[in-house]
Amino acid sequence: VELSSFQLMGMKHSPHVAAITNLTPNHLDYHKDFEEYVQAKTAIYRNQTEEDRLVLNLDDEVTRTLHASGNLFCTSKKQELANGVFLKDDIIYIAEGGVRRELMPAADIRIPGAHNVYNMMMAAAIVQGYASDDDIRAVATTFGGVEHRIEFVREKDGVKYYNDSIASSPTRTIAGLESFQQKVILIAGGYDK
């Protein structure tokens, strides 16, 4: 379940497993500043206990500064981890207590884009201990994505059309554009937020 800053404001209970993939300015038409936005997003783990798990992306300059009340499990494409999911030489590894095991090649992830490698690593960290490595690999290699996120719409006259309308911030739009290796024509609209 993905929760927006609006849904998290005033949250009284935290899930046993929570994750924050990254934090970039968003919904600043509603929040007075980025700090207030971060406070709203971090409410997801504010009431966790020692037994709970928080998953953070260590490569994000904001999320790497956050602190867990319970067990911290991280992801990184830039460094090997003792506890978490990391990428090394295009292979995704899971590490627990300093012992690592190979999960899968990043190239086997069905959904395109570097940001989806992060998303898959986060998902693997979230379900670690609840799902087998085989199940994680099966999902990563078969899951085609969700509506409105680089969703293939159709091909007409050799042109492929994709819907990425959920990309409602510059960082999300850039991540989506970087998923394509071929020339892209972007049709965009909306308003500042």
Predicted regions and their residues:
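Short beta->alpha connector loops
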Residues: 4-6, 60-61, 78, 167-168, ...
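Residues that form or immediately flank small-molecule/cofactor binding pockets and catalytic motifs
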Residues: 59, 75-80, 97, 145, ...
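Short, Lys/Arg-enriched charge-dense amphipathic segments
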Residues: 2-5, 22-30, 70-80, 156-162, ...
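Nucleotide phosphate-binding/pyrophosphate-handling subdomain across enzymes
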Residues: 105-193
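Short coil/turn connectors at secondary-structure junctions
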Residues: 13-16, 50-51, 68-70, 81, ...
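Beta-strand->loop->alpha-helix junctions that form or flank phosphate-binding loops
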Residues: 69-87, 137-141, 151, 190
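Flexible active-site lid/hinge loop adjacent to a nucleotide/diphosphate
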Residues: 1-66, 72-74, 85-89, 93-94, ...
